[in-house]
């Protein structure tokens, strides 16, 4: 007889929700986390689209450690000496059914893990899982952690993008470097009123701000800023291969240092104290690098299943992880009740994902990673073009005024009208 009905590896969003669903159904479930606490090994820019969480915990707003409701969307094209920003807000963004929030993964993940434990899940922290155990038929039947072997009817892997256990469990090729990015982030402590004033936010409301161009020194990637209640999260994500293949590429940590000094950013964090520094690998390939989601006795969810998309204007992953964790937990319960946790018995998980927004979204944007990877002009050409156009419009030096088209067309032609049309066509196809 197995030690547990289910073992969940990883106490992140997918793992804690999967463990919660299993425990709520009365199953014996063990959640194993290599960090000393839930969230210790997790990093995010900081934005949670809350629709998935609301399906698990309808009243989460009353108890979850949320930072601010995001009510401002800002997107910037940057050069070293300029910044062009679109700032959007609407009543729809404040609607509870469509709300998103900034979060800090440490406190948020601990709260979510506590919900699983309160439901009856057992959790152990500070324990890395070294490998999986298989029975004589090859079915996954547990984990090995140090000298201990712990068995279960089903194992759910939610241990992140660089999951060696996932590669062991379902045997797939490691994602190419072109489909993986690395992110670094710092959290700057400021008082609540100062953040409201500097970011032009009402109390309790916040901004999500994405930067393209000089934020990554012209290579594939971008910068981000999220307002927390009493801090600002600022970071950079850059493609690993783009950095490695670019001559004299700037290290990612230096990109962040330079972003902090940019004229558009420096005043916002002036006088702030750095209270956190973190790094994380980010899956950028979407469904193109997604491994098999099930095997005999095993399921994958969250980053270990590469459930993430970066559209340039929007980054999503946490809502996918929560939804996948919920479906993994629910389908594991059904498989346990049916007495069949083979690959065939776990097929319901894949079917549920196929019918959900998770795989529908990832399939919809299957061409986007390749488009963004080769969209060099977004990270170097267009920021310069926009800067020059804006300068031609707003800089007054006493010279006679010339028609706008005479100022703008030479700038556009330097970029190449056919190049612009090609990029628009590619964006329409990919997005």
Q: What is the role of each PLM region?
A:
Residues 94-114, 244-248:
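Short beta-strand to alpha-helix junction loop
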Residues 372-431:
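C-terminal auxiliary extensions adjacent to catalytic cores
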Residues 25, 35-81:
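N-terminal FAD cofactor-binding segment of flavoenzymes
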Residues 3-31:
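N-terminal Rossmann-like FAD-binding beta1-loop-alpha1 element of flavoenzymes
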Residues 308, 327-378:
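Active-site-proximal substrate-binding core of FAD-dependent oxidoreductases
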Residues 115-265:
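Predominantly flavin-linked oxidoreductase catalytic cores and closely associated redox partners
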Residues 215-223, 229, 248-324, 341-343, ...:
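FAD/FMN-dependent oxidoreductases across multiple families
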Residues 14, 37, 162:
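Conserved Rossmann-like nucleotide-cofactor binding loop
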